[in-house]
Amino acid sequence: MTAQNIDGKLISQTVRSEVAARVKARTQAGLRAPGLAVVLVGEDPASQVYVGSKRKACEEVGFVSKSYDLPATATEDELLTLVDQLNEDPEIDGILVQLPLPAGIDSTQVLERITPEKDVDGFHPYNVGRLAQRMPKLRSCTPKGIITLLDRYNIDLRGKHAVVVGASNIVGRPMTLELLLAGCTTTTCHRFTKDLEGHVRQADVVVVAVGKPNFIPGAWIKKGAVVVDVGINRLESGKLVGDVEYDVAKESASFITPVPGGVGPMTVASLIENTMIACEQFHSK
């Protein structure tokens, strides 16, 4: 058995096309296009690449993309003042502050300052809390993108034992909540977990988000399991690999996300979708 690759590039393009059609319908009806504000502090090269791809995706679907690039010397107060201005801007539906922020700026303070109805990253405690209470509005982009991928491949999650490896606020924790909502029995593994191998070997669905190349040996994957690899790691050779030993894992899995081209494109697609939802549901009065 060789796993079927889950094509994140294809599904993300489908999602973007669907959003573009909704934008076109809005503008043809005389309504404004959705607006996304992207805030970058400092000159971190990886952040610049991510921000560039998000801005490009916005423009492709017909959004109004507004860029705010602050120097690395910007203070927390300056950033909070900008967030306050964007919260009040009637043409901005979504506010994205690119992480990580420079030392000296409290990212929790900044993310909590974004009004929940413009929190298109889905990081605000209000939005995470709504997901926990089975009433999601704006959902964390990467977990939402993963659920979209599994849904588009008609993978039924109800009753499955799902194991999430990694417990970050950005992926692991909201992913656990998403899988719970989808009807899974969920286990979250983290740095204090004993017998990680035992947990992974039992999993019908494995989601790995730890940021360590080939962290999960392919031999741990149960026959027929669905493997979602969130990691993207560059080896010294320049090759990009995930957190799961792909070549071995694909021999046992039924479905697997490749790296690159699996989960990554869906994060941006979910951001686009969240901005559309924010515009339609919260700011079209």
Curated annotation (Swiss-Prot):
Enzyme Commission number, as recorded: 1.5.1.5, 3.5.4.9
Superkingdom assignment: Bacteria
Pathway in which the depicted protein is active: One-carbon metabolism; tetrahydrofolate interconversion
UniProt binding sites for NADP(+): 166-168, 232
Gene Ontology biological-process entries: L-histidine biosynthetic process; methionine biosynthetic process; purine nucleotide biosynthetic process; tetrahydrofolate interconversion
InterPro entries attached to this UniProt entry: Aminoacid_DH-like_N_sf (IPR046346), NAD(P)-bd_dom_sf (IPR036291), THF_DH/CycHdrlase (IPR000672), THF_DH/CycHdrlase_cat_dom (IPR020630), THF_DH/CycHdrlase_CS (IPR020867), THF_DH/CycHdrlase_NAD-bd_dom (IPR020631)
GO molecular function, one term: methylenetetrahydrofolate dehydrogenase (NADP+) activity
Catalytic activity: (6R)-5,10-methylene-5,6,7,8-tetrahydrofolate + NADP(+) = (6R)-5,10-methenyltetrahydrofolate + NADPH; (6R)-5,10-methenyltetrahydrofolate + H2O = (6R)-10-formyltetrahydrofolate + H(+)
Cellular component GO terms held in the UniProt record: cytosol
Keywords: Amino-acid biosynthesis, Histidine biosynthesis, Hydrolase, Methionine biosynthesis, Multifunctional enzyme, NADP, One-carbon metabolism, Oxidoreductase, Purine biosynthesis
PANTHER family per record: C-1-TETRAHYDROFOLATE SYNTHASE, CYTOPLASMIC, C-1-TETRAHYDROFOLATE SYNTHASE, CYTOPLASMIC-RELATED
Function: Catalyzes the oxidation of 5,10-methylenetetrahydrofolate to 5,10-methenyltetrahydrofolate and then the hydrolysis of 5,10-methenyltetrahydrofolate to 10-formyltetrahydrofolate.
Assembly, per entry: Homodimer.
Family, as annotated: Belongs to the tetrahydrofolate dehydrogenase/cyclohydrolase family.
Name of protein: Bifunctional protein FolD
